[in-house]
């Protein structure tokens, strides 16, 4: 699906870090986003450098962003216009392998060269092709299914500062989707730690779900051009599974903030005037180009889960604030919840979903979720009084509510598949019906006699009965 044209050659006239200016013959200037190739030799190393056209400067000059380090590139080197934009391999063959933003296989060099290739710059589906129905994606995680239900074919964000469990929750979702639904997943590692990418590769192989997952990495040590394009490369692979094979695909992006950050670096390198807080003036446009392609078409979908790093825990920062506009559900991971040892460390009061509506999830689900939120909100309101005067100064009704809220908090925790090797406890999947039933009983006080510890890091009602019995209590 990539267009080809007669190849023309230019020469490098200026190099400033990852920014390269190339001069072409008059009338042969390459189009914006075209990929250019330069053959360079650096010591004993010979390699092909890929550049992407970012600006037309006039006088047959183009300004490009390099997708690899420019070590060894010198003025006067010949640069060839490929006549097409960067393209990546697509199809079933990409599953079980790791690729970079250019579509080169990292675990098996040379693999995938003969596959069908699609351009990473594509238009979103036409409005008439979009899926009009809204459907819930059941995950088996109690806190998610009850309070922030995910939309099939929607965009879900995991917000949180550093070290609160965003990557672990993404690994958990890959595990659950592969084991419980047998779906295809595509993982985009955008500007994150190389160590985490290696850990994910090993864990997916150990869990026997690597065969259903394609991984595309552009990590922290890569130039900004690569980090800016790696999400588009992964999305292109996911679009093939959706459009050509009619599959429901899960796209994981870790971390969408690094996509914005790379765009900011590229914008500065290109000499654009910075916008608010130093971000690029095209921030909303670049985010929209990515997010609009992540959608459901009739009968098939791409559901995306995006980790969003929040700089200094500031939610008014333009990067997370711009992401908010595109989301169907937000799961906020909180340091306060994390410090209590509750995992996943989801803040139920700060998280939200557009489909927590009786018309979509049903009256009973909505009623139970709202009652849980009411109890937790009241508990939060009472925290100052408890801290100053102590719990004994509360009314009997409030004491009962506080005890119930503490049980709800602990019951929202769950043993996870991604943490099995650390906890020694198998991960649990709780059906939505059982989750609603359990929390309905909990809010009505049917479990008030059970010790708080019985609710901690367990699955459903069967687990609760076993834990309670081990602590000398009965349901």
Swiss-Prot record:
Where found?
Cell membrane
Q: How does it sit in the membrane?
A: Peripheral membrane protein
Q: What GO molecular function annotations does the UniProt record carry, in alphabetical order?
A: ATP binding; ATP hydrolysis activity; proton-transporting ATP synthase activity, rotational mechanism
Main subcellular location of this protein, as a coarse class: membrane
Keywords associated with the record: ATP synthesis, ATP-binding, Cell membrane, CF(1), Hydrogen ion transport, Ion transport, Membrane, Nucleotide-binding, Translocase, Transport
> Pfam families annotated for this entry?
ATP-synt_ab (PF00006), ATP-synt_ab_N (PF02874), ATP-synt_VA_C (PF22919)
The record lists the catalysed reaction(s) as:
ATP + H2O + 4 H(+)(in) = ADP + phosphate + 5 H(+)(out)
- Listed GO cellular component terms? plasma membrane; proton-transporting ATP synthase complex
The positions annotated for binding ATP are 160-167
* This enzyme's EC code(s): 7.1.2.2
- Which top-level enzyme class is recorded in the Swiss-Prot or TrEMBL entry? translocase
Under the heading InterPro entries, the entry gives: AAA+_ATPase, ATP-synt_VA_C, ATP_synth_F1_bsu, ATPase_a/bsu_AS, ATPase_alpha/beta_chains, ATPase_F1/V1/A1_a/bsu_N, ATPase_F1/V1/A1_a/bsu_N_sf, ATPase_F1/V1/A1_a/bsu_nucl-bd
Q: Which residues form the signal peptide?
A: none
Family listed:
Belongs to the ATPase alpha/beta chains family.
Q: How does it assemble?
A: F-type ATPases have 2 components, CF(1) - the catalytic core - and CF(0) - the membrane proton channel. CF(1) has five subunits: alpha(3), beta(3), gamma(1), delta(1), epsilon(1). CF(0) has three main subunits: a(1), b(2) and c(9-12). The alpha and beta chains form an alternating ring which encloses part of the gamma chain. CF(1) is attached to CF(0) by a central stalk formed by the gamma and epsilon chains, while a peripheral stalk is formed by the delta and b chains.
**Main role?**
Produces ATP from ADP in the presence of a proton gradient across the membrane. The catalytic sites are hosted primarily by the beta subunits.
NCBIfam families in the record? atpD
Protein name, per record? ATP synthase subunit beta
Source organism per UniProt = Mycolicibacterium smegmatis (strain ATCC 700084 / mc(2)155) (Mycobacterium smegmatis)
Underlying gene: atpD
């Amino acid at each position: 699906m990539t267009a080809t044209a007669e190849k023309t050659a230019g020469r490098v006239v200026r190099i400033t870090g990852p920014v390269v200016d190339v001069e072409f013959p008059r009338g042969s200037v390459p189009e914006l986003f075209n990929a250019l190739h330069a053959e360079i030799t650096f010591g004993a190393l010979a390699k092909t450098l890929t550049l992407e056209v970012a600006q037309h400067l006039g006088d047959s000059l183009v300004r490009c962003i390099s997708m690899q380090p420019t070590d060894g590139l010198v003025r006067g080197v010949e640069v060839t216009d490929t006549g097409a934009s960067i393209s990546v391999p697509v199809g079933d063959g990409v599953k079980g392998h790791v690729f970079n933003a250019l579509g080169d296989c990292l675990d098996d060099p040379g693999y995938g060269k003969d596959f069908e290739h699609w351009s990473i710059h594509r238009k979103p589906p036409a409005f008439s092709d979009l899926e009009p129905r809204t459907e819930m994606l059941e995950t088996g995680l109690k806190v998610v299914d009850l309070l922030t239900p995910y939309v099939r074919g929607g965009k879900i964000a995991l917000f949180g500062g550093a070290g609160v469990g965003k990557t672990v929750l993404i690994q958990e979702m890959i595990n659950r989707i592969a084991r419980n639904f047998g779906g295809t997943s595509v993982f985009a590692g955008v500007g994150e730690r190389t160590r985490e990418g290696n850990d994910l590769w090993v864990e997916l192989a150990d869990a026997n779900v690597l065969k259903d997952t394609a991984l595309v990495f552009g990590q922290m040590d890569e130039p900004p051009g690569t980090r800016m394009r790696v999400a588009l490369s992964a999305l292109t692979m996911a679009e093939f599974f959706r459009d050509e094979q009619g599959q429901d695909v899960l796209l994981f992006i870790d971390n969408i903030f690094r996509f914005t950050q790379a765009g900011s670096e590229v914008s500065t390198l290109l000499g654009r005037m910075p916008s608010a807080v130093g971000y690029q003036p095209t921030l909303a446009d670049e985010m929209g180009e990515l997010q609009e392609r992540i959608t459901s078409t009739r009968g098939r979908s791409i559901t995306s889960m995006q980790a969003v790093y929040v700089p200094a825990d500031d939610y008014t920062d333009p990067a997370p604030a711009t992401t908010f506009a595109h989301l169907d559900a937000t799961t906020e991971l909180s340091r306060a919840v994390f410090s209590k040892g509750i995992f996943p460390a989801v803040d139920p009061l700060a998280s939200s979903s557009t489909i927590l509506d009786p018309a979509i999830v049903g009256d009973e689900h909505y009623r139970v979720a709202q009652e849980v939120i009411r109890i937790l909100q009241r508990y939060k309101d009472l925290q100052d009084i408890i801290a100053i005067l102590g719990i004994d100064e509360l009314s009997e009704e409030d004491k009962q509510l506080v005890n119930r809220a503490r049980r709800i908090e602990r019951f929202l925790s769950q043993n996870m598949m991604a943490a099995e090797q650390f906890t020694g406890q198998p991960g649990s999947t709780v059906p939505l019906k059982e989750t609603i039933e359990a929390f309905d009983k909990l809010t009505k006080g049917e479990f008030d006699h059970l010790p708080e510890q019985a609710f901690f890091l367990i699955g459903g009602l069967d687990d609760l009965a076993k834990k309670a019995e081990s602590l000398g209590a009965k349901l």
